[in-house]
Amino acid sequence: MEFLLLVKTKILSFIIRNINGDISDNTSKFYQINKIWRNIKLDQIPGDYIEFGIYKGKSLYHSIKSAKRIRIDKDRIFWGLDSFEGFPVENHNFYKNENFTSSYEKVLNQFSKFPEVKIIKGFFDEELQKEPLSDIKKVSFAFVDCDIYESSSDV
């Protein structure tokens, strides 16, 4: 089963890269998220999931579905953090704010049917110091999906 998933992932990655090289290769990322959740279950690691940089929420959604698929315990909270304003840095060669802003309201609506999901709007360096994030006791899976160094260094 794992082999077939890997083959499908590689084939889809190849197709996506050859259609448009600028398209992010999410299939490999999603495969790794599945693997991490399986290891968390196997090793019985307690704690919440926290994702830094959710953009439109695709990875967060995939992570929730992966955890549910393998019946991860239901008392975990899935935290999603993003500024929803693009990047805090203006000068970057590749990443432009107009390509990376997303709608906080749309993301909130997308996850409204998941009571275990908490979406936090703001910059990481500020939000990590405040409640409710400062009250997190244990994290089993931290996914840092930042596109620039300045943001990831705050995590």
State each model region's role.
Residues 3-24, 43-155:
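S-adenosylmethionine/decaboxylated-SAM
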